[in-house]
UniProtKB/Swiss-Prot annotation:
Cited NCBIfam families: apcB
Membrane topology: Peripheral membrane protein
Keywords: Antenna complex, Bile pigment, Chromophore, Electron transport, Membrane, Methylation, Photosynthesis, Phycobilisome, Thylakoid, Transport
SUPFAM superfamilies per UniProt: Globin-like
Gene3D superfamilies listed in its UniProt record: Phycocyanins (1.10.490.20)
UniProt superkingdom: Bacteria
Organism: Synechocystis sp. (strain PCC 6714)
UniProt GO cellular component terms: phycobilisome; plasma membrane-derived thylakoid membrane
Description of post-translational modifications: Contains one covalently linked phycocyanobilin chromophore.
Family matches, as PANTHER family: ALLOPHYCOCYANIN BETA CHAIN, PHYCOBILISOME 32.1 KDA LINKER POLYPEPTIDE, PHYCOCYANIN-ASSOCIATED, ROD 2-RELATED
Name under which the protein is recorded: Allophycocyanin beta chain
Family of this protein: Belongs to the phycobiliprotein family.
Subunit architecture: Heterodimer of an alpha and a beta chain.
Gene, per the UniProt record: apcB
Sites of N4-methylasparagine modification: N71
Length: 161
């Protein structure tokens, strides 16, 4: 896992040069949005269970996946889905704080699509639930922070699609 600062510095270091104007601008933007990201992470942390619960209600609860024969029908499968959605929310929050999506590749996406396909987990329902998490989160943290968080939730969706 790296953060935006490490990414900028590593890029310059690999090239053997000092930070240029574009690199400095990336750092300025990262620091300027720091308070917003920390406040959003605090709200998300305090409301994570509610965010996941509302997202499931919006996207999955009354769909075919929760009916008999659906992929989330048994209590065990439903609990696994809730666990996974909480996991995505948590790691997207980490990525937002770091200003870098690399943790999502390392700890969430590597092999996830293949695992879901082998287990018969419907990717489209998962993506729909993550999009619902994005909506619920934005309603709690506000438009600007919601947009920032949305970048990382969309990244997960893209990685699954």
């Amino acid at each position: 896992m790296q953060d935006a600062i490490t990414a900028v510095i590593n890029s310059a270091d690999v090239q053997g040069k000092y930070l240029d104007g574009a690199a400095m601008d990336k750092l300025k933007n990262y620091f300027a949005s720091g308070e917003l990201r920390v406040r959003a992470a605090s709200v998300i942390s305090a409301n994570a269970a509610t965010i996941v619960k509302e997202a499931v209600a919006k996207s999955l609860l009354y769909s075919d996946v929760t009916r008999p024969g659906g992929n989330m029908y048994t209590t065990r499968r439903y609990a696994a889905c809730i666990r996974d959605l909480d996991y995505y929310l948590r790691y997207a929050t980490y990525a937002m704080l770091a200003g870098d999506a690399s943790i999502l590749d390392e700890r969430v996406l590597n092999g996830l699509k293949e695992t879901y396909n082998s287990l018969g987990v419907p990717i489209s329902s998962t993506v729909q639930a993550i999009q619902a998490i994005k909506e619920v989160t934005a309603s709690l943290v506000g438009a600007d922070a919601g947009k920032e968080m949305g970048v990382y939730l969309d990244y997960i969706c893209s990685g699954l699609s």
